[in-house]
Amino acid sequence: MNGWAGVCLITHCLNTRSRTYVALNMLAFARTPRGVPSCLFNKVWVSRYALVLILMVCASESSTSWAVTSNGLPNCSTVTRTAGQDAELHGPAPLSCNVTQWGRYENGSTPVLWCTLRGSRMRVSLGHRVAFGCSWKTFFIYNVSESSGGTYYQKGYNCTDKHITLSCFNLTVVPRAVQSTTTVMTPTLVTNSTFSVSLVALRLTTNSSAFGHAIYQRQQRVENGTLSKNITNLAFTYGSWGVAMLLFAAVMVLVDLGLPQSAWRRWRSHVDDEERGLLM
């Protein structure tokens, strides 16, 4: 059993298309040998539970372990934004891809995954301290700063035209113009023949404190909305796998204890008794 299950587990880790098929193969070959008592906590069942748990954990992980390096990248598109603006990176990956990933190259060559889309589900990596969003064709970065600049990539897997598609974007963030303030001393004549001097501040800028406060509130709303959406997606993904593992474990326990077989035998015995009663 352990040999077949190990082969199936290795096949699962190498195969990124169909995990359900591998799970069925493992369950088909993982049977209790003859002469071994069917017990919930014997060595065979303990090893079986361990392999199934490993399989579930591997299945919950998407194909994010595929290495992406900056070597051999296509010609990257250049995107320039001023600090404080929003940036949109439009990728050419078609909707025919089963999986789409967005990320950024750190330190020039190390890929860091930010977002993964698989079907109707989205998985977002937290901790980047950047308000962003992603879709199948567009990656959004809100209120960019100088630290937001760099090389971003989009990768599609299992596409109809080719197995893997890759595109990259060089985001350049230009700092804002330096705001200057000029103070002019102007005399003011009062009607009671007294002379006083007042300061008149002439600000050579169009930005006001109210406008800056509105931008800050908008940024906070975007970050809070993105964070709540990411938490909801993570809770749904891991909650679904938790429910599936509990149901699967319950079915395995019932089968191992022989409850379905016992219920079937009792029902057949009851039917046979009724048939014999009718014949008599």
Swiss-Prot record:
Topology of this chain in the membrane: Single-pass membrane protein
Main localization of the protein described in the UniProt heading: host cell
Taxonomic superkingdom: Viruses
Compartments where found: Host membrane
Transmembrane is among the record's keywords: yes
CC annotations in GO: host cell membrane; membrane
Key words, A-Z: Glycoprotein, Host membrane, Membrane, Transmembrane, Transmembrane helix
Glycosylation sites: 75, 98, 107, 143, 158, 170, 192, 207, 224, 230
Annotated TM spans: 235-255
Annotated family: Belongs to the RL11 family.
Name recorded for this polypeptide: Uncharacterized protein UL6
Organism: Human cytomegalovirus (strain Merlin)
